[in-house]
A protein has these predicted regions:
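N-terminal, polar/charged subdomain of small-to-medium soluble alpha/beta proteins
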Residues: 1-77, 83-113
């Protein structure tokens, strides 16, 4: 958030929305998980962020993904911050960016107990 507040266009920001992805103890289908590993396509990530920064009202998008190492339950996986003018624009941009990251940028390997 401090980095966003230093953005030269911060005066246009009316909302900062954050997604913090965490390793949970169960998979989507309910199986117990002991951890996971995430691989990231960095070129595609840059493209996704650049495209979504062009959405109406968006000032900044910042992403950090903890990749290429084993993560355990409770570890942070991803932090995504979207700053923009109004709620509707910021929520739409966060949703679109997150969906694109999950479907086009990252590959997750879960380790089951």
């Amino acid at each position: 958030i401090a980095q966003i507040k230093r953005h030269p266009d911060y005066a246009r920001v009316g909302m900062v929305l954050c997604h913090q992805g965490v390793v949970r103890a169960t998979s989507r289908d309910g199986r117990p998980v002991r951890g996971l590993r995430v691989a990231v396509n960095l070129d595609r990530l840059r493209q996704v962020v650049a495209a979504n920064k062009q959405r109406p009202g968006i000032v900044e998008i910042l992403v950090s993904i903890d990749s290429d190492r084993d993560l355990k339950v409770g570890d942070d996986v991803m932090l995504l911050l979207v700053a923009g003018d109004i709620r509707e624009n910021v929520i739409a941009a966060l949703s679109a960016t997150l969906d694109a990251i999950k479907t086009q940028v990252t590959h997750k390997t879960e380790y089951f107990t």
